Amino acid sequence: MTVGDTTSGSGEEPAADSSVHATPHHEVDHTVEPTDDPLAIRLEALILGADRRYTPFQAARTAGVSMDLASRFWRAMAFADIGQAKALTEADVLALRRLAGLVEAGLLSEPMAIQVARSTGQTTARLAEWQIDSFLEGLTEPPEPGMTRTEVTYPLVELLLPELQEFLVYVWRRQLAAATGRVVQAADDEEMVDRRPRVRFADLVGFTRLTRRLEEEELGELVESFETTAADLVAPTAAGLVKTLGDEVLFAADDAGTAAEIALRLIEAMSQDETMPALRVGIAFGTVTTRMGDVFGTTVNLASRLTSIAPKDAVLVDGAFAKELVRHGEAPESEAQAAEAVAAAAERVRLAEKEGREPDDEPPLPTYRFGLQPMWQRPVRGLGVVEPWLLARRGKTGS
């Protein structure tokens, strides 16, 4: 017997009742007219693929899910509280069945199912808001005089909906495959024992002042250009763009060289655009806590602090990240050490020529992509004394 089921063991149906709790799910009244704008209801039905049919209680009961669990799922997905209005469809029932079924089958714990609902709801809510705003942005004037915004929106959604739905599923599958591949590769790679991510913040300088000076459209274009540039630089690498916050982006990678390269390329790309303000980047190395696609912890806080104290158009890194670059041969411990390595290589070549051997037989000259310059030590609230390093790109090999 499902939650709210009022039938007895005799199989007789209960008497009709005005209470929604007494309405069996197979006797849903389809004659009740919604009080909302009929055209808006048509648009909603187009998007949802079905007409309004169930109250929340009826949907939960039809799905065989307790009202308490259904409510928690809906709250997690950030659905509006509609009371017991008849506003849900067959798709809502099916979604409840599927999510609850994963819990019953032991594939997900109940807290994990709630988390899945919340992360999916938050991600798609932002995507939906962005898409509808973008599609309707240019429709300030109706195609024909007297047309309402709903009348303008309906044919546009009718054309776009099936294509966008297929595209969304395609992109999600590609991203899922990429994320799964990274996890599997990390588990199989014996050398990658330490999976502490390198976390980077990139922050536009003087963004608050810009918000007062620029028009809304100009500000939007600037933010979009910044986010697009960051995403384009991160996408081809093994790094991941965690989130964008207007004037700030957060991305993470497991390889120190990749992290440093992205940071410097971002500085270089932004400095070539005269319309963009200066950029500051902070990188920290350490463990992080991941939750619903976001990252938290001391490493993230340190990267953020380094960004706030970095010079304009510069990259500051913490000591742990600097050691990683040195350990992997991406940067010398110091410029003096790099000069000694070059001098030693030159001496090996000289001795080889003196002995009649080919210099190519000698060990190659050290190749350093990056240079590190120690900066001033300073106390950072909650993190103690921090000694940042200024990251820069070195010139030609061995220089």
UniProtKB/Swiss-Prot annotation:
UniProt: Mg(2+) binding residues: D203, D247
UniProt keyword annotations, A-Z: ATP-binding, cAMP biosynthesis, Lyase, Magnesium, Metal-binding, Nucleotide-binding
Cofactors (names): Mg(2+)
Cysteines engaged in disulfide bonds, as pairs: none
InterPro entries recorded: A/G_cyclase, Adenylyl/Guanylyl_Cyclase_3/4, Nucleotide_cyclase
Ranges of biased composition (kind: Polar residues): 1-10
Gene Ontology BP, a term: cAMP biosynthetic process
Region (Disordered): 1-35
Catalytic activity: ATP = 3',5'-cyclic AMP + diphosphate
Textual note on the cofactor: Binds 1 Mg(2+) ion per subunit.
SMART domains found in the cross-reference section: CYCc
Known EC number: 4.6.1.1
Ranges of Basic and acidic residues composition bias in the record: 24-33
Gene3D superfamilies recorded: Nucleotide cyclase
GO function term, MF aspect, one: ATP binding
Signal peptide: none
Record-annotated Guanylate cyclase domain positions: 198-307
CDD domains the record matches: CHD
Family statement drawn from the similarity comment of this UniProt entry: Belongs to the adenylyl cyclase class-3 family.
Name recorded for this polypeptide: Adenylate cyclase
